């Protein structure tokens, strides 16, 4: 078998008949499969052992040779080679066809490659192939030209003979008529009898004339057809063709069926045709030029490759190995077989019948019919259902052909090559394991025993608990006592991988150290639930076991959960306290003035209370019941660093780091701060979820990951402990309805009645009434919400949950205790009657009914969203899978400018710097492309420095507003990106490693939150067209589609002339440079004019006489990215796409770094359309990689030629995926047959650069530790190491002392030996 590690590229091409015969181990001659009595394969049949190899290892068919000692012998009786049975998986056979057939992919695919090659319309080609028309394959023009006059004379003679014969016949008939009439007259016959005879005679004469005219017309048609006869001409009329063959057979040849196509291909001159087509492209216009371009693609493909076009017509059909189309016996003696066997049987049956008919010399019509049936059966074998009705099996089910085996989700590519089942794995329900450390998981004993079975068995033998592996296996299966001790030893420090489906991003698989637990459920650490998106309502997880030392090392170093605290999408921590833990820490750090033991200053009669010399003393007081954990106290601290603002004051008073200081805080906060690492400033705040998140964020920036992991573990333990101690419970008594609710609703009800009256009087129309009511009831709902918040006491547990950030929000509390408010109908519009009841009071029947619309839509949306989001992720992964960090620095000077702050002038005229809201996702974690300097030109941060939070703060403090940073958009690495342009890896907080699969991480980061995005297109008040939002908008942007209701953009800078019609606007821009006016016609008024800031600082819609800049949007809506590219160029379209995608995600509160979106956008803009090919090899109109385009142009210019001209093109992600260089990757994505057809014709070679290609062929992927840079490392010893390994003694060494020993590697002193014995 082929070893995948020994080849570097994979080429696909067309196989000739000789290739097929060379692959084959014998011809399949019979349609038989297995003998139903002996259950052995039939000789020369589809499962024949002689062709495909023995069914049993080392045993021939007749049983003469058995056992391995006869290896390689071919049995003289049955002809079977004695070898392993597994050769039946790789040996192919073939069927020798009695007549050639065309390959359906090349004839029926769109576009028809055969049609383009031969310049025949697919309809005509079909007529030829399926025996409905003859085609002229060759014409001897010279001979015809030379003999044309002779032939014409002959034809004229024949025509004259026909005419003479006609005249003679007519003359004779006329005479006979005269004689008959004369006779009748003599007999005195009546006039009507005479008339009848005359009519009869004239009719016969007319028929004679018609017959001879038809004969003359036929001769004319034959002659005309013959004189105009040209190759590739179709003749549908069989009689005409036969006549032509009989008369002029020596001047031309013609045929029908695949034989005709084969002859046409054999006579085809590729070079001459290519030259003609190039000439047509140079001089032609319109459709003619387009068709020539398309044809040239196919012709050039054959011209530039080793392929012969003859491969599209088959003389032999390969038969795939029998083990790949098995036949198995079921209970009850029936057989289940692969559909392919049925399809092969049809081909063999028809082929054998055709051979017999040809041998018998059957009439041509019968033979042609059989040939057509053979063609159809081969079509069905290759691609059933592509032409005509599919061949069906039992129960009218279409049979699965070879193409169907490759296509779709169940096809070979996606089902078996890109996703395989894995051994050493298990799955079980998950339960929470709060006692675990962050890097641990609980593994059920029985599952661990099964997973680690081989390891346990080996260890049992090593420790002499068992004599051999067999007895060790028995011990494990019987679960002897020693087994458990050995299992404990074996699993120590052997990480396992846990995976929860769906694995939406890379944190869906993480490594943990297993801890054995009782029961059958896997225990999961509560902090990793966020990354897995797991909860404990019945979720299941799979466990996988890394076996080799390398796999274990990768799992431990790269995948251990404590090393994956940060989100790869935003670089912010994911392993953060949630839910109960947040509640516990919030409770712990709350301050309640006047609680038990609270600090009180010294009075007249009483000493100062609530002052403690150390945290230990305060804890003792709490244990005694003299102090509440939430009471404000003063306590002397030595271990913790004071907060920054306190520290500044203390320094002024002569305090030194390490001295004690007094904090005014609560015991809870002191306990909380003891959980934080040493040296972290004291946090004297109530711990809302956001504050906790900011602290962990800060820890991740400042401390090593191991410290962060230990800290979040401590926070988890404290959170659970204090959540339990807090006793937060929720009951009906806690749901308090605000007493002002009735009064508020009455007030707004009167307001609504007023609107109704105005509507009744006709003062308002339907839409205005609706809008007014919606506004009124929204205000009412908000007011009830406010009243509710004021009414709830601070210690109410229901409001504690949203306030602490643990779960829920105040809207849900409002629904529970206030009022539900307005709901939408199925169209997504507000129903103007609100739901006035709260869930506590209960809804009326009508309220309940209208509420169900929204609830049902929500569920339907979620289901649709999940599928759409998954598909989007799949396309994103496919387009970006070969973006891998290939080198440290590409050396480019280019970069992009990013705004980090904006200058704003206040009312007092002072300029203040406002930090940019999106700094987290734009400038953060990037590398500087140029020195960042302040106003005086001092360098603040040097080029090549990483922009972390401290560096950004420094720049903001110095008043810097814009920085130039490196970006993947400007990276010049050939394939993939360089580490400096990519910047910091969001998941590790350090510069990205070489080998990181940046593209896949980007795709996952964008796809994973996809499910959270909304589906619906929302109505904006009064706008007729819906504005697309949510997931459909992201898809629309990445697919580079023209948006729905697109807004025009200004092509030039100039003044606007606005004309308003009844339903449309007409905008004309008069350019500043005096160029031609640009007119935008028929702009719907429903779309509204764009509102923007004008020169005078006001914000208003576009008006007549306004000045617009190039690229400015003129109407509301979304701009077309293709227009932006055309008008503004590639850089602006990149900015546009990144901002528009971020707009959608930000609206849902999802944080994704710009660099991920940039990776995808870079892939969309990778190609160039060739406008003029110059002296290059490119075809005009073809798409090519920008890097290839530039390198080819450099080569041509160096040789003194004309470079090609091209323009950048924006491709949607699906199109870009299919246009990838790797045919394996494209075929496994979509449109498998089309991609393979194209790749085979072009004889495409796959360099195996991406990830999918390598997964498919089973090689290590060229990313991470599989990248060549790491695989090709060899150890070079240093000089010191070499000296230590190979010591050469000097003469002073003790080796030359009298006790000189052997085997020291020293020189032998020959003079000390006597040689007398040897002489």
UniProtKB/Swiss-Prot annotation:
Lineage: Bacteria, Bacillati, Actinomycetota, Actinomycetes, Mycobacteriales
NCBIfam families, alphabetized: PRK14906.1, rpoC_TIGR
Binding site for Zn(2+) 2: 890, 971, 978, 981
Protein name listed in UniProt: DNA-directed RNA polymerase subunit beta'
Binding site for Mg(2+): 535, 537, 539
EC annotation from Swiss-Prot or TrEMBL: 2.7.7.6
Alphabetical keyword list: DNA-directed RNA polymerase, Magnesium, Metal-binding, Nucleotidyltransferase, Transcription, Transferase, Zinc
Catalytic activity: RNA(n) + a ribonucleoside 5'-triphosphate = RNA(n+1) + diphosphate
Organism per entry: Mycobacteroides abscessus (strain ATCC 19977 / DSM 44196 / CCUG 20993 / CIP 104536 / JCM 13569 / NCTC 13031 / TMC 1543 / L948) (Mycobacterium abscessus)
GO biological process per UniProt: DNA-templated transcription
